[in-house]
A protein has these predicted regions:
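Residue-level recognition of tetratricopeptide repeat
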Residues: 1, 35-36, 71, 109, ...
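Terminal, low-structured helical/coil segments at or just beyond the last alpha-helical repeat
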Residues: 209, 216-255
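Register position in tetratricopeptide repeats
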Residues: 5, 40, 75, 106, ...
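Canonical tetratricopeptide repeat
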Residues: 33, 68, 106, 140, ...
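Short coil turns that delineate tetratricopeptide repeat
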Residues: 24-25, 59-60, 94, 98, ...
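TPR alpha-solenoid repeat register
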Residues: 26-30, 65, 99, 103, ...
């Protein structure tokens, strides 16, 4: 682990050679670490080609391996593929278990990224019926509803419930702040979004949100600073960059 974190990939490869194919758990661990090395050295496509070729050799992969592959596809923005494997897992596990709720959450988030709000809501609400206080599902669903302008009061209630459990989670704090922004309470929005950006200063979405609320509070030079930070981030998706570019040139009201 340390050699991988320190980017000493040659040492990591030497260590991983000791993991034999006969031991499925440790061998799969080796394959995942090799996937990470290839991802860091050569990029997403080459890493996916590697792990897919290895995964396809398994005739009866364990639930753990299926879950890892589903997550790899989700992190690679191959959401259709991730849904396929999350669905396979759901067919194999107890429908009342916390694990079932967790996988529903993951599948629901993939549906949401595809714009399939109907199936996303269905999975997330089902997950909450099993684990009604899960702060991350409450946050994800509440934030999604706010973005869609759907059931605003219920969405804010969910975010408050999540925040009461995770008061130092920057993503949950950002969601609460954004909720205040969307209902026009810019003073409270600024308080929460400022706290979120202090905890996660490099996150492009939090920077963008904080820029928006500063603009509404007529702190326009500061707003442009945070928009620019978001625009410059390597993690910022192209669609968001397009919106930020307009904001930097013409202001928030033109988006």
């Amino acid at each position: 682990e340390n050699s991988l974190e320190n980017k000493n990939y040659n040492l990591t490869r030497k260590i991983l050679k000791n993991f034999k194919e006969e031991d499925e758990i440790y061998y799969w661990y080796k394959l995942k670490k090799m996937y990470q090395i290839i991802y860091n050295e050569e990029g997403t496509d080459q890493a996916l080609n590697y792990i897919e070729a290895k995964f396809n050799k398994y005739t009866n992969p364990s639930i753990k391996i299926l879950y890892d592959m589903a997550n790899i596809y989700q992190n690679s923005k191959k959401f259709d593929e991730s849904i396929k494997y999350y669905s396979k897992i759901l067919q194999k596990i107890n429908k009342n278990s916390e694990t079932y709720a967790d996988v529903l959450y993951k599948r629901g988030s993939s549906y949401e990224r595809l714009g399939d709000n109907e199936n996303s809501d269905k999975d997330l609400l089902k997950s909450l019926s099993i684990k009604p206080n899960d702060p991350y599902v409450l946050n994800y669903l509440g934030y999604g509803w706010l973005e869609r302008g759907y059931k605003i009061k219920d969405a804010i209630d969910m975010l408050d419930k999540a925040y009461n459990q995770r008061q130092n989670d920057p993503f949950i704090i950002d969601s609460v702040g954004w909720g205040y922004f969307l209902i026009g309470d810019y003073v409270n929005a600024e308080i929460f979004l400022r706290k979120a950006i202090q905890l996660m200063p490099g996150d492009p979405i939090i920077n963008d949100h904080y820029g928006d609320v500063l603009w509404k509070l007529n702190r326009k030079m500061q707003a442009k600073y945070y928009w620019q930070s978001s625009f410059n981030s390597k993690e910022t998706e192209e669609e968001l960059k397009k919106k930020i570019k307009i904001k930097l040139l013409k202001g928030l009201d033109k988006v």
